[in-house]
Structure formats: C-alpha cells, structure tokens
C-alpha cells in the first residue's frame, strides 16, 4: 500500500532533511482514500496540513467528513479540494437550484458551496479552480463577507443536494 511504500522509500526522512534545510516550511499531503489509510499516514509524521475532498454532495467521499473529524481531533489544519465538484455544483441548473434562488438570489451556486464549507472551523484553505474574472470576483465577494451559516441556508443546500441526487448518480 502507499503508506508502506512511503516508509520503504524513506520519504519522510528525506522531507525532514528538507525541512531542516529550510526548503520545506509546511509538510502535508493530499488524500483520496479510506479513513484507515488516512490514519496510517498520520502515524508517519506530525503533518502541518492534510488536503481532502469535501463538498455538500460528497460528505462521504473518502475520507470525507469522517476524515475532517479525524484531522480536527488531531488539530491538523484541513485544506479542501473539489469544493464545487469539478464545476458541477457551480452549474446546477434551474429548477434544481430553486432553493438557492429562494434563499438569496444574489448568491451564485458556487458561493453556496463555499459558504457550506466555511461553517467548519478547521478548514483553513478552500481551493477553487477559477477560469474567468467573473468567478474570481464572485469568490472574493463570497470570502470577503463573514456570514453565519444559518439553518435556512443549510436547508436550502440540503434541498438542492436532494434535487441533484434524485436525477443524477453521484
């Protein structure tokens, strides 16, 4: 398995040298694997961060929310990849996204993805693949305003998620 291979190759010892030399400041890793692999990897080193996939549609995607909880319990900051599921959640069509429009028509589909993740205090970075100036501005607008994640927003997100799941196998 990959964790055993990392041990065999002495990768962590090599990284420790780079840290001592100042070539690496923060050591972390990205994972798409079951929680058991995450737990094994965390035994290798006192990592500065771990990157996982998480979005309102993929709460159980390995390691998913369970991975977030494990990392939070260990005080390891979390970096999020795929917050809009490769763009799919940014392009949820009407009428599937009607609950978003009803909650706040000024918010983009993507902004709901980010607002959902901002409720988790141990998420320190949310990666966002942007391909236009409009998307950059939307992201800046979303992250510029601190907003309480309300039950009404959570309900809107849950309803959109259920609308998507009714028509699409994820």
What residues fall within each predicted segment?
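Acidic, His- and aromatic-enriched active-site or binding-groove loops in soluble protein domains
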Residues: 16, 48-60, 105
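Short beta-strand/loop segments at the ligand-binding rim of alpha/beta enzyme cores
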Residues: 18-28, 77
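Catalytic beta/alpha-barrel core
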Residues: 5, 28-33, 51-58
